[in-house]
Amino acid sequence: RDKKENIYDDNYTIISQYYPVERNNNASFKDLHLLQEAYYNTGKGDRFGLNAWYINSNRELGRLTSDQSDGTRFENRQREHTLRSVLSWDHTRENWKLGTKAGYIYTWMAYDYKNDKGNGDMASMTRSRSKINTLYGQVDGEYFLTEKLLFTAGLSAHQHFVKSSDKNIITLVGNRAVVGYDKARVELSGTVSAKWRPIERLGMSVVLREEMYGDNWSPIIPAFFVDYVLSKKGNITAKASITRNYRFPTLNDLYFLPGGNTDLKRESGFTYEAGLSFAVGKDNVYTLSGSASWFDQHVNDWIIWLPNFKGYYSPLNIKEVHAYGIETEADLALRLAKNWKLGVHSTFAWTPSINEGEPMSSADQSLGKQLPYVPEYSATLSGRLSYRSWSLLYKWCYYSERYTMTSNKKTLTGHLPHYLMSNVTLEKGFSLRWADLSLKGTVNNLFNEEYLSVLSRPMPGINFEFFIGITPK
């Protein structure tokens, strides 16, 4: 509803206005996803694994609702090729366990924007290319000193090589031409923890973590967790935790063109959480579980991407953010008859995220306001009805009003209305001699809801998908 049309009388006086209904024909996509997993168990406590994922994506990016141009006169396309591969080894003994992983990730991503020069000849305005190579390794270990005391330790390392450029733009640094950015960074993370259960009802754990990003080290990051069974009947358990948090800017945060900000500071803060959980049930009849928790988080130098006066998004630090709220969750599994099963899962969250920092200028109206694009309320509900190899799945979600500006002004472009979303899926499974086969049909946006997740980018109305899943035996 960004394009308003005027209706004039014979004297060219506006007598009425309306928003025309338009169709966005620039949002097609083709995706190919392949996953292969292979495991070998020696039967002597060792398991070896190989996992590989491949993604080939080619999609158009739909026009903004504020774009009044002819959709046939431009091309706005993003392509991606990604390969993720992991080798793993798990070694298990009576009172200790060791696991290792090594992997490689390659991503090639292209963004092209072309515009018709007027004679049908498409001119490239943007030719963005990114290549990301990541090597990583991980080692985790567990050791039971006694039945009541468990020690764990872990170490992970990532080496990123990122080259990103726009072939239509060349910048100069000194006397050297630089196209985009070409950066490498090592990231290390190490953790040690001790988990102690002195009595059957009480459990406590302490975690110490330290991280390195490039040349920057975090201080030692502690966390403490405790849980206590208030009642064995219903398995009612109280839980609480306090955690120190750090987050370093990503390479995109620092160097993305256009918009990267090399002056970003790392986030830091504390999170406090407390809650209750329960679980009841009857064998082969039903199980019911649920939890409710309160959290309070104070973050200094929160990193957020916001539009700037130059017309594109750029990350910046918010001096202090106070995020708090309540989160609830419930699960029900019910056997209705011999071959009939019903599963229900629901969540609800109230999560204010308030800017409590310092004004950036005399005109700054963001203090005391909700952060942009963060809903204060959200909820989900899903239900699965199964009969033998058939299943019917219904998903529902709700997101409250979100603001697009730090001032939280409720103008036409200053907020996104709340919306409800429903999806339904029917699935049939087949067991063949050589593979398990699944056929699945999905109706997304069942009630054809009009909604936005990002300003000026309308989401699809009712749409349909069909999936074929093959799992070799």
Mark where each language-model region is.
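Gram-negative outer-membrane beta-barrel transporters
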Residues: 197-201, 293-298, 317-406
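Membrane-embedded beta-barrel scaffold of Gram-negative outer-membrane proteins
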Residues: 95-113, 231, 237-239, 266-324, ...
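Outer-membrane beta-barrel transmembrane domain signature of Gram-negative proteins
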Residues: 77-86, 91-92, 104, 112-205, ...
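Outer-membrane beta-barrel channels and translocator barrels
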Residues: 41-45, 92-96, 144-148, 197-203, ...
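Flexible loop and strand-edge segments within Gram-negative outer membrane beta-barrel domains
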Residues: 2-10, 21-33, 39-98, 106-132
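Transmembrane beta-strands of outer-membrane beta-barrel pores
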Residues: 1, 54-58, 93, 104-110, ...
